[in-house]
Amino acid sequence: MLAVAKTIAIRQSLGLRRQTIFLSFGGWDHHGELLNTEAGMLSVLDGGLTGFQKALEALGLQDDVITFTASDFGRTLRSNGRGTDHAWGGNNFVMGGPVQGGKIYGTFPDVTLDSNDDVGYGGRMMPTTSVDQFFGELLRWFGVSSADLSYVLPNIENFYSVNSSTLPIGFLQPGTWS
């Protein structure tokens, strides 16, 4: 993560306003020993994100960077033995100076098994916020106009009106997007 912070630090000498850097941290497909395995991995993730934020602060870049986590699947709430099965909903972390932090965005589901939010199959919750909405807001931070979002995110209009004067979710600080 320190190497990423250093790469961000030289962006101006490369003539870049903003960059996209992708890191992969695999091994989250826990079908067994979910609690023990995930606790250790969350500790590693926490240490990495904390170290990254401290490096950004040391470089004076904390207000210029957004860190976003994403996954291609969630987990069911009901155990299938020693773990859980694949599901649709999940969660994302968004952090950085341009972010209105300390909030939960989206609608938290009723996590009671067989509730109206449970679509069956052992606690699969219907997502309430599309990843397209997260990406749409990040694209606005990169300077993509609202009208052009549907070129990059063909499904965005299923969740957000590109003619809106507001952001898809609202996690960006006012004045940090165009």
Go through the PLM ranges and name each one.
Residues 1-18, 22-30:
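Accessory "access/gating" subregions that flank catalytic or transport cores
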Residues 17, 27-178:
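Feature marks hydrolase-like catalytic cores characterized by long aromatic- and Gly/Pro-rich stretches
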